[in-house]
Design a protein with these regions (language model features):
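Active-site-proximal alpha-helical element of nucleotidyl cyclase-like catalytic domains
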Residues: 1-15, 52
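Short amphipathic alpha-helical segments
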Residues: 2-6, 107, 191, 195-198
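Helical mechanochemical/support elements of P-loop NTPase systems and associated helical scaffolds
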Residues: 4, 23, 39-42, 49, ...
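Residue-level signature of catalytic and energy-coupling elements of molecular machines
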Residues: 8, 24, 53, 79, ...
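Catalytic core of nucleotidyl cyclases, primarily class III adenylyl/guanylyl cyclases
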Residues: 11-45, 59-102, 127-132, 150-151
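Conserved NTP-handling cores and scaffolds of large molecular machines
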Residues: 12, 57-64, 111-117, 133, ...
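Intrinsically disordered, glycine/charged-rich C-terminal tails and inter-domain linkers
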Residues: 74, 116-201
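Catalytic/regulatory signature loops of cyclic-dinucleotide turnover enzymes
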Residues: 80-81, 89, 102-123
Length: 201
């Protein structure tokens, strides 16, 4: 567990997250305080961090297997973006720098709902990260303190920057171009056709 928590904490800190607390074998992490890069970038950094953690765990499992630890360690991650209260809370004798609020409770609910070894995010977070993160619709939930259902999404992967735009379209008099990267099987053939067209001009 110490090996696992050490690796996950390292990823969290490098990603700009604040490690709030360890709860058994779980970690609570938040973004946006004491420093924020803006709500969108904070959300993207958090989801990217979770995906890095998921990949790192695969490497740890292989290492543990070599050591003879056959039982896999499964994880679930829940992420929600909301306004929360951050500060020092506790008693006169002991204070903890932590975050509280309904948003924290919803993130915990998402974690408990997530499939094994998956990342589940709220609609709030999805709307902030959908340009950079591939997600699949998962389910709707009724959260405590909310009068409406909340859509949830499962993280599928991080979109490559160079392939973020899948379609290229252009049209002028005597010229039409439409490229759909999702349907291309042989990129070299397409490049050859484009070069051919340029030569004929």
């Amino acid at each position: 567990i110490t090996h696992y928590l050490t690796k996950m904490t390292e990823i969290a800190i490098k990603s700009g997250g604040t490690v709030d607390k360890y709860i058994g074998d779980a970690i609570m992490i938040f973004f946006g305080d004491p420093e924020s890069r803006g709500i969108r970038d904070d959300a993207l950094a958090c989801v990217t961090m979770a995906f890095k953690m998921k990949k790192a765990l695969n490497g740890l499992r292989k290492h543990w297997k070599k050591l003879g630890l056959a039982e896999p360690l499964d994880v679930r991650m829940g992420i929600h973006t909301d306004m929360c209260t951050v500060g020092n809370f506790g008693s006169v004798d002991r204070l903890d720098y932590t975050v509280i609020g309904n948003g924290v409770n919803l993130a915990s609910r998402l974690e408990s709902m997530a499939d094994s070894n998956e990342i589940l995010i709220s609609e709030n977070t999805f709307n902030l990260v959908k340009e950079g993160i591939d997600c699949n619709y998962f389910d709707e939930i009724i959260a405590k303190g909310k009068s409406h259902s909340i859509k949830t999404f499962q993280v599928a992967g991080i979109k490559s920057k160079q392939h973020s735009s899948k379609k290229i379209q252009a049209s002028k008099n005597g010229f039409n171009l439409m490229i759909d990267k999702n349907k291309i099987n042989d990129i070299d053939e397409i490049i050859s056709l484009l070069e051919d067209g340029i030569e004929k001009l």
